[in-house]
C-alpha cells in the first residue's frame, strides 16, 4: 500500500527536535521558523511536556466521554485564566476543522438559521462546513457546495450590515488574523463594529483563532487587540504543541443540552496531559509576552530591500511579502541556510516560529536572509 499522494514534500526527514531546532536523518541541524505550521508553541520536546504525556500514558491513555475526566476540568480552568474568558464553556475535539464545524453547528442551533457570512481570503478548514466558509474553490468538492454562505470583503462593515438586515444569518465567522490568506489583520475598529452589528442583529460572532490564537499574536487571542468578546472562539494549533486537539470556547448565552455535540476522541487523557502541560508552560515562561517582544524585534529587523514589498503581522505570526515569487529564496533558506519557513501564496514567506523563539534565533535568520537578498 502507498500513501495517498496529496502533499508536496521537501527532501528533509526530521528525526529529532528540541526547542527551536530540528535535526534530520543525516545529522543536519535546522532553525524552525515554521513550527509545524504554527503548532509548536512551547518548543519541540519541552521536558515538562514530554514528562506529562509519558506519565499519563503509564496511568491511562484513553477512555470515552462517558466517564468523568478531571483533566478536562483542569484544562478549562487554565484556559479561562490564560484567556480572561473564565465565564465561557469549553468543548473539546481533535482539530481546528472540527472546532469550526461545531461552532457553526452551535450557531445554527442557537439561532434556528443556516446562512453564514465569511470573508474574502478566509481559510477555516477542509471538512464539509469549514471548507464551505473557506474562500478557495479548489478545496471544495461538489458535495461541499450546497451550504448557504455569503463571502464579503474584509473590513467592509456596511456590506456586513446590509446582509445582516435580511434577517436570515446564523453566524459571522472571521479569523483573528488571516493566515493562508496572507497574514491579513482585520482592522481593530472593524472588529469592534462587527461585534456591535452582530449583537444588535442577534447573530452569532465566531472568531477563528486556530492559527492566530494561543498567544501567537502577542495576545492570548488575536481579537483581543480590538478589545472584543465574541460569542464563540475556536482554537487548536498551539493548544497541545503537536498532540491532536481542538477547542471551542462558548459564551454563557448558549445552553448545553445532552447530545447536541459529541466526540469519541476529543478530550482524551493524553491530549489533556499535553494541553495542561502547555498551559502551565505558557504561564511559567511568559510566552505570550515573549511572542510579542521577539515578534516586534523580528519585524523591525527585516532588512530593507527592493525585493521586499511589505512586512506585516502581530507577535510571531509574520508575513514577509516579496515583489516576486519566493519559491527559490525559500528553498535556499531551507537547503543552504537550514532554516524552515512557511509560505502564503506565491510571494509571501510566512513565519510561525515556536513562541520560545529568542532574539539570537532571529539574528541567525536575518543574517541568512541578508545573504540571500
Predicted regions and their residues:
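Conserved N-terminal phosphate-binding loop of PLP-dependent enzymes in the Aspartate aminotransferase
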Residues: 1-373
Amino acid at each position: 500500500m502507498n500513501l495517498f499522494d496529496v502533499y508536496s514534500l521537501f527532501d528533509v526527514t526530521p528525526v529529532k527536535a528540541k526547542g527551536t531546532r530540528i535535526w534530520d536523518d543525516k545529522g543536519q541541524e535546522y532553525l524552525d521558523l515554521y513550527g509545524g505550521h504554527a503548532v509548536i508553541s512551547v518548543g519541540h520536546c519541552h521536558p515538562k511536556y514530554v514528562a506529562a504525556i509519558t506519565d499519563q500514558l503509564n496511568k491511562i491513555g484513553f477512555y470515552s466521554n462517558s466517564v468523568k475526566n478531571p483533566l478536562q476540568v483542569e484544562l478549562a480552568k487554565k484556559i479561562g485564566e490564560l484567556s480572561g474568558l473564565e465565564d465561557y464553556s469549553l468543548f473539546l475535539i481533535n482539530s481546528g476543522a472540527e472546532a469550526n464545524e461545531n461552532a457553526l453547528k452551535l450557531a445554527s442551533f442557537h439561532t434556528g438559521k443556516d446562512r453564514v457570512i465569511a470573508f474574502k481570503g478566509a481559510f477555516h478548514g477542509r471538512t464539509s462546513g469549514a471548507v464551505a466558509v473557506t474562500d478557495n474553490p479548489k478545496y471544495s468538492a461538489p458535495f461541499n457546495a450546497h451550504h448557504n454562505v455569503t463571502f464579503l470583503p474584509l473590513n467592509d462593515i456596511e456590506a456586513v450590515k446590509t446582509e445582516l438586515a435580511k434577517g436570515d444569518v446564523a453566524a459571522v465567522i472571521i479569523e483573528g488574523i488571516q493566515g493562508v490568506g496572507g497574514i491579513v489583520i482585520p482592522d481593530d475598529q472593524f472588529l469592534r463594529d462587527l461585534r456591535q452589528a452582530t449583537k444588535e442583529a442577534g447573530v452569532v460572532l465566531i472568531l477563528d483563532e486556530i492559527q492566530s490564537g494561543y498567544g501567537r499574536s502577542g495576545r492570548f487571542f488575536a481579537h483581543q487587540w480590538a478589545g472584543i468578546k465574541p460569542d464563540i472562539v475556536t482554537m487548536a494549533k498551539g493548544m497541545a504543541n503537536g498532540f491532536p486537539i481542538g477547542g471551542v470556547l462558548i459564551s454563557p448565552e448558549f445552553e448545553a443540552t445532552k447530545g447536541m455535540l459529541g466526540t469519541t476522541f476529543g478530550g482524551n487523557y493524553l491530549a489533556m496531559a499535553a494541553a495542561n502541560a502547555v498551559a502551565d508552560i505558557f504561564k511559567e515562561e511568559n510566552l505570550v509576552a515573549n511572542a510579542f517582544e521577539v515578534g516586534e524585534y523580528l519585524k523591525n529587523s527585516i532588512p530593507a530591500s527592493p525585493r521586499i514589498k511589505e512586512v506585516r503581522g502581530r507577535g510571531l505570526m509574520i508575513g514577509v511579502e516579496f515583489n516576486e515569487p519566493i519559491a527559490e529564496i525559500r528553498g535556499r533558506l531551507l537547503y543552504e541556510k537550514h532554516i524552515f519557513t512557511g509560505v502564503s501564496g506565491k510571494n509571501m514567506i510566512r513565519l510561525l516560529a515556536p513562541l520560545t523563539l529568542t532574539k539570537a534565533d532571529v539574528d541567525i535568520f536575518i543574517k541568512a536572509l541578508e545573504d540571500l537578498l
